[in-house]
Amino acid sequence: MQEAPAALPTEPGPSPVPAFLGKLWALVGDPGTDHLIRWSPSGTSFLVSDQSRFAKEVLPQYFKHSNMASFVRQLNMYGFRKVVSIEQGGLLRPERDHVEFQHPSFVRGREQLLERVRRKVPALRGDDSRWRPEDLSRLLGEVQALRGVQESTEARLQELRQQNEILWREVVTLRQSHSQQHRVIGKLIQCLFGPLQTGPSSTGAKRKLSLMLDEGSACSASAKFNACPVSGALLQDPYFIQSPLPETTLGLSPHRARGPIISDIPEDSPSPEGHRLSPSGGCRRVKGLALLKEEPASPGGDGEAGLALAPNECDFCVTAPPPLPVAVVQAILEGKGSYSPEGPRSVQQPEPRGPREVPDRGTLGLDRGNRSPESLLPPMLLRPAPETLEPVAPVDVLGPSLHGREWTLMDLDMELSLMQPLAPETDEAELTVKELNSSGVGKDHTLGTPLMLDVQADLEGAALSVPGALTLYNVTESNASYLDPGASPSSP
């Protein structure tokens, strides 16, 4: 106890060891305070038995305070660490527990190691001294560059958002325009094809073209049709001719001659009698014949010829073909060819066929004795023809009663035939075509023999009786039309 105070004056002397470490070395080694603070059995640490008594009794003797927390904080500043045993586990109260501190350079009996114990320098001060100005400037530049990139990215993102909104608006506008165009196209299609689908002849109706000859008259087509009513039964055959008006004439000039008029007649339209007239019915097939006859020229003008028909009963009307030139008539009489008037044909033209040989049916025997064709006719046929054509009953030609196929004069086989006088029958159609001879100089007026035209037709009902004409002969069944080479003339 007397040696400890002697050592105290030497501690504050000049030494590289800090004052706190010297006081702590003396405090731990003082035997008078072993009941409160002492070395551990291993000598590498010291123990504090009662912290409250140690703070009140021992600390004021060596230090200027009696605070145990300040003493522990100074120990931590010099690198001392608190040792916690496994038996305690840190669950007992600190007032009654033993507190143990240790440091690698604070060992019992080795005072020279105290020089290694240093006070901890704050790490922040050392780190601040390591930063250089160039590093700081570089760091600031990088931060500014990152901020610029971020701003440009945000601006680009905003621009993309605006463009996206514009594109969506355009898409909406295009959709509206597309729907409007779709509705307009639908209405156009309905307007164009609606009448075809809802009309009476829309369900698979095959429309055929009826070729009729325009005679140059000033009256309209409806007037021509209504002028001479036609019976629906007589139009079952595809070949029919409408009679011209009495006042109409045809010119022989090629510049004034007009072509045929094409008219549509539906095939499937119902008949006014309520039933469909079939060509294969009870009626028998007859052959109509036409006769060209010379007559004096009309006073209307030179070079014009009128074609007139004089039937007894106007069950169906006949349209006269264009005037035949004299050279053509002579060629037909000599058997060199057939006549086909020029004009617009139907859309689907038949394939051209080779020239047909005209069979030699003998001579008419008119060159002997200066005999005329009228002398060969029976007396019962030589009766005067009526002046005008009076229809029996008004029939709507353009109505749905016009069934069957069409007959064009261009498809008739014009051949020279033998004159065979026959008794008039109710099932025969007799046509008389009269051609006027021109009074001009240099023209041929010698038509001594009549021209026979083979007319193939399926006629039902009353027959047309042509007075003053001769029924020449019946054409054989093998004589088919040019419109359909492979089918019979009576086939629909």
Curated annotation (Swiss-Prot):
Keyword Repressor included in the entry's annotation: yes
UniProt keyword rRNA-binding, yes or no: no
Crosslink feature (Glycyl lysine isopeptide (Lys-Gly) (interchain with G-Cter in SUMO)) location: 293
GO MF terms held by the record: DNA-binding transcription factor activity, RNA polymerase II-specific; identical protein binding; RNA polymerase II cis-regulatory region sequence-specific DNA binding
Keywords: Activator, DNA-binding, Isopeptide bond, Nucleus, Phosphoprotein, Repressor, Stress response, Transcription, Transcription regulation, Ubl conjugation
Region described as Hydrophobic repeat HR-A/B: spans on this chain: 129-203
Residues carrying Phosphoserine: 298
Ranges where the record places region Disordered: 263-282, 337-378
InterPro entries linked to this entry: HSF_DNA-bd, WH-like_DNA-bd_sf, WH_DNA-bd_sf
Gene3D superfamilies to which the protein is assigned, alphabetical: Winged helix-like DNA-binding domain superfamily/Winged helix DNA-binding domain (1.10.10.10)
Modified how: Phosphorylated mainly on serine residues. Phosphorylation on Ser-298 promotes sumoylation on Lys-293. Isoform HSF4B is constitutively sumoylated. Sumoylation represses the transcriptional activity and is promoted by phosphorylation on Ser-298. HSFA is not sumoylated.
DNA-binding region location: 17-122
Taxonomy, superkingdom: Eukaryota
A biological process term (GO) from this entry: negative regulation of transcription by RNA polymerase II
Region (Interactions with DUSP26, MAPK1 and MAPK2): 245-322
Subcellular location: Nucleus
Pfam families assigned: HSF_DNA-bind
Major localization listed first in the record, in broad terms: nucleus
SMART domains linked: HSF (SM00415)
Annotated Gene Ontology cellular component terms: chromatin; nuclear speck
Tissues in which the UniProt entry reports expression: Preferentially expressed in brain and lung. Also found in the eye. Slightly detected in liver and skeletal muscle. Isoform B is the major species in various tissues.
Family annotation (PANTHER family): HEAT SHOCK FACTOR PROTEIN 4 (PTHR10015:SF213), HEAT SHOCK TRANSCRIPTION FACTOR (PTHR10015)
Quaternary structure (record): Homotrimer. Exhibits constitutive DNA binding and forms trimers even in the absence of stress. Interacts with ALKBH4, DUSP26, MAPK1, MAPK2, MAPK8 and MAP kinase p38.
Record-stated family: Belongs to the HSF family.
Biological role stated in the UniProt entry: Heat-shock transcription factor that specifically binds heat shock promoter elements (HSE). Required for denucleation and organelle rupture and degradation that occur during eye lens terminal differentiation, when fiber cells that compose the lens degrade all membrane-bound organelles in order to provide lens with transparency to allow the passage of light. In this process, may regulate denucleation of lens fiber cells in part by activating DNASE2B transcription. May be involved in DNA repair through the transcriptional regulation of RAD51.
Descriptive protein name: Heat shock factor protein 4
Organism name: Mus musculus
Taxonomic placement: Eukaryota, Metazoa, Chordata, Craniata, Vertebrata
